[in-house]
Amino acid sequence: MGYFEIDVEDYYFPEQKESRQAALEGEYDVKCNYLGEIPYSEARNKSEVNQAIARDIASHEKYILCGVTINWSDEILSTIQKVFWLKVNSAERVRRVKRREEKRWGERVLAGGDMYEQQDSFRNLIGGFSEQKVLDSLSDFKGEIVELDGTLPISTNMQIVKEKLEQIN
């Protein structure tokens, strides 16, 4: 459809983009040069992330910004036309992330592994995201909010997304 993907994680942790893309394609042995000894241990700050995202938005007429909330600068928010909110309960969200990270990092994210504490903290963080937190982040958004059921097949939700994006063009 010609949209440029802006995944927020890639901006906080730019060195992991190749690894994330490979994982989406089912490849889990891609090696990256991380900023710290442990992947995801050294992040850019929010100001740097906002600037980098704003630059990429300015460079791409059509983009999809992927992330948990939309607490962005007015410059970024003013360009967003639709929000797709993939709704899934916290327990399922944590289960999916845990499964994905175990596939991606193996024993490193299990108890005793060098990434265990970091990933455990991350799972606790995402498990604590409430629907209210997302609603609060959307409070100033003026565009359409499209709710997607995260328990439905990916193909079903993708069809909804495709139809909504076609309305923009």
Roles of regions detected by a PLM:
Residues M1-Q51:
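Conserved substrate/cofactor phosphate-moiety recognition/catalytic segment
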Residues N71-D74:
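Short, well-ordered alpha-helical microsegments
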